[in-house]
Amino acid sequence: MIRKSATGVIVALAVIWGGGTWYTGTQIQPGVEKFIKDFNDAKKKGEHAYDMTLSYQNFDKGFFNSRFQMQMTFDNGAPDLNIKPGQKVVFDVDVEHGPLPITMLMHGNVIPALAAAKVNLVNNELTQPLFIAAKNKSPVEATLRFAFGGSFSTTLDVAPAEYGKFSFGEGQFTFNGDGSSLSNLDIEGKVEDIVLQLSPMNKVTAKSFTIDSLARLEEKKFPVGESESKFNQINIINHGEDVAQIDAFVAKTMLDRVKDKDYINVNLTYELDKLTKGNQQLGSGEWSLIAESIDPSAVRQFIIQYNIAMQKQLAAHPELANDEVALQEVNAALFKEYLPLLQKSEPTIKQPVKWKNALGE
């Protein structure tokens, strides 16, 4: 009797799992299409820095898995990035259907999920330099998990790579979002062994780079939160000898909403922690840019109008991509033209600077 009961339970679970897997599998393609539509609608509104179109192809839906390719096409190219019109960034996507994706079960995770996915960058004309820099390994690989409530988590693994004079070791970043909104996002990450070769005899190294960010969007228009990016244990090296050391270089951003008002305050802070030259400790410093009472709607309009104008300039004058001075002049002219949009809220700007010696004075 016990054996029959156990068999019945197993059969029931198999039916439930199979039915759930079939159902969640039917939700993948509509979800992909909605994501693409939202992305392309944002392009039409001028919210992207470049004229890009998102699409998918080769959708193959199985019972436990769905596979397809996601591709982002630069319609008019990106001259400042040496991207030609029509070039694409392509991703191979392998989705495991919920409610219990097999890979997650193999790792002991029995929490039901809508789907889990593996995303890999495709080696093509545009992305080939990334694969060469990573010594023919995939430069980035992503693992995603989508919950039934709309939240998601992503782990991004970064391969060691060397891009000319800049190199780094392996790294990993995690992204956790609420309601499938990239505006409500927690980010943590770390990359090891960073090297910037300034010349054959001079270089700057950092033991690691870390990032910790928590951001959300209130009422769909007020960005708030804080982030911290840090280069740890920096060494400035000349002819093989350490010239100076810095315990950490930190960049912090804080955004908070002004109470009972449609404004936000922004605080950008850069910190230099424990600068040492030879045997001499020179202290620590801090520089901040504080902007109070900023209208986020005005900032959004500024970015949109600026992006649209810059896209038109680059499309009409592709030679700007190879003329840094001319490009800076265009940037300055566009910034001046659309600056009145930012000045609607009449923000208050402060730039405090602090420095303490080794004695804390």
Language-model segment annotations:
Residues 4-8, 16-361:
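Glycine-rich, small/hydroxylated-residue low-complexity segments
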